[in-house]
């Protein structure tokens, strides 16, 4: 029996991205494998018709998944016993794809998002759920932390916030963890201004913030230094071969979302 899911605004995007991953997984030559997403979509009583038609959103989600999965896996191979903090997790299932490669994994999100996650995913260790905002200092009190290396993932969130909110999130991270790396997805100001996702039309979710590159982000987040910057063009290359050509065009790379890797100053 399917369970009815009522979501509005930003939390609605978590259902849309889940569907995108499930849709790709079901393809014959799928570029990702997210069987949990497939099973969750089967259980959800939700109208996915808009998401089904929003190819731009689907390609973006899959490209991001390809790139971030690769980056997170490489990081965890180099850093044993890492504590992972996944901010604005929604219905993300990366913790299962990376199973056995981390010490503890904390999925953090707002109450309305976590209410839905808890309906379908029981996480009691080494994956845990924290029902709080990433701008609430107290969420770190729920993390079992003893000076271990920490990896923070911020995916699909910053474009819905403002600069004050971004600074608050990074300030909490900086104050709370000794050795910490942040992998954060950013959107270009051009896309923020000119693009609207078809799949969330009519919702309260709107793009509100972006930066051109890592240098611009570092000027805002001075306590961290940029270590790496990866365009989602790298993921698009595996979905659409034409991106091996057009991905070399500076304008294309500049307006594509990026994963920026930042480390706290020692």
Regions found by a protein language model. Name each.
Residues 1-85, 89-132, 145-146:
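Rossmann-like AdoMet
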Residues 138-147:
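Short amphipathic alpha-helix with an adjacent loop that forms part of the alpha/beta core around
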Residues 152-153:
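A conserved beta-strand element that flanks and buttresses the S-adenosyl-L-methionine
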Residues 160-173:
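A short, conserved alpha-helix within the catalytic core of class I
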Residues 176-189:
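Conserved beta-strand signature within the Rossmann-like core of class I S-adenosyl-L-methionine
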Residues 189-205:
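Short, glycine-/aromatic-enriched active-site segment of Class I SAM-dependent methyltransferases
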Residues 204-234:
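Short alpha-helix
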Residues 240-266:
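Core SAM-dependent methyltransferase catalytic element
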